[in-house]
């Protein structure tokens, strides 16, 4: 396939073959909001970035005075309940991403945002759940990535080389296809 002269590569990683593997939490599962918020606050005090993937966890932090460096949201919780944002950031980005996939271009977008000193919000038209993968690969060691585990709580991943290796291993098992 010739892609050299295309402005946009229309390829995705597809994860249909990995649904079971991806359904379990890959970090610390917090079921108590007070313990969760205390942990996040201490991480911020130590100078690490907080990155959220999901509307509900982003909103819980915001309502408790914690503003994530980067939020990846789609405006919904459990795929249908609209979420209204209380905080507006200076830098907002919009991407499209199908459920069960990650578009190649999103890796570069997230990497660039995490290099920027201001962070921002990525609004996803589609599904944001799997964008934990490019977030972890682009985050610095020590940063914390938070996502919601439906009907369970919030999962916190402390980024390190072991986690990045695990995420790269999952990515290698994904199927590359046209979006």
UniProtKB/Swiss-Prot annotation:
EC number: 2.7.1.237
Keyword vocabulary terms for this entry: Coenzyme A biosynthesis, GTP-binding, Kinase, Nucleotide-binding, Transferase
Known pathway: Cofactor biosynthesis; coenzyme A biosynthesis
Binding-site residues for GTP, renumbered to this chain: 55, 57, 74, 76, 128
Claim: Kinase is one of the keywords in the record: yes
Keyword Nucleotide-binding: yes
GO biological process, one term: coenzyme A biosynthetic process
A GO molecular-function annotation: GTP binding
Any Pfam family: DUF359
Recorded catalytic activity of this chain's protein: 3'-dephospho-CoA + GTP = GDP + CoA + H(+)
Family recorded in the similarity comment: Belongs to the GTP-dependent DPCK family.
UniProt function note: Catalyzes the GTP-dependent phosphorylation of the 3'-hydroxyl group of dephosphocoenzyme A to form coenzyme A (CoA).
Name of the protein described by the UniProt record: GTP-dependent dephospho-CoA kinase
Species, as recorded: Saccharolobus islandicus (strain M.16.4 / Kamchatka #3) (Sulfolobus islandicus)
Organismal lineage: Archaea, Thermoproteota, Thermoprotei, Sulfolobales, Sulfolobaceae
């Amino acid at each position: 396939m010739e892609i050299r002269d295309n402005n946009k590569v229309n390829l995705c990683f597809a994860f249909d073959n990995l649904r079971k593997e991806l359904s379990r939490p890959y970090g610390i599962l917090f079921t108590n909001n007070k313990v969760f918020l205390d942990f996040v606050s201490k991480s911020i005090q130590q100078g690490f970035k907080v990155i959220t993937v999901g509307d509900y966890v982003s909103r819980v932090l915001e309502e408790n005075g914690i503003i994530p460096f980067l939020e990846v949201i789609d405006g919904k919780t459990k795929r249908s309940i609209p979420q209204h944002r209380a905080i507006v950031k200076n830098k907002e980005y919009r991407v499209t991403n199908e459920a069960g996939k990650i578009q190649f271009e999103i890796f570069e977008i997230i990497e660039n945002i995490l290099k920027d000193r201001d962070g921002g919000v990525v609004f996803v038209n589609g599904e944001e759940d799997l964008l934990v993968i490019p977030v972890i690969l682009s985050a610095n060691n020590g940063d914390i990535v938070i996502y919601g585990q439906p009907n369970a709580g919030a999962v916190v991943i402390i980024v390190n080389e072991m986690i990045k290796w695990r995420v790269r291993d999952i990515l290698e098992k994904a199927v590359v296809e046209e979006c």
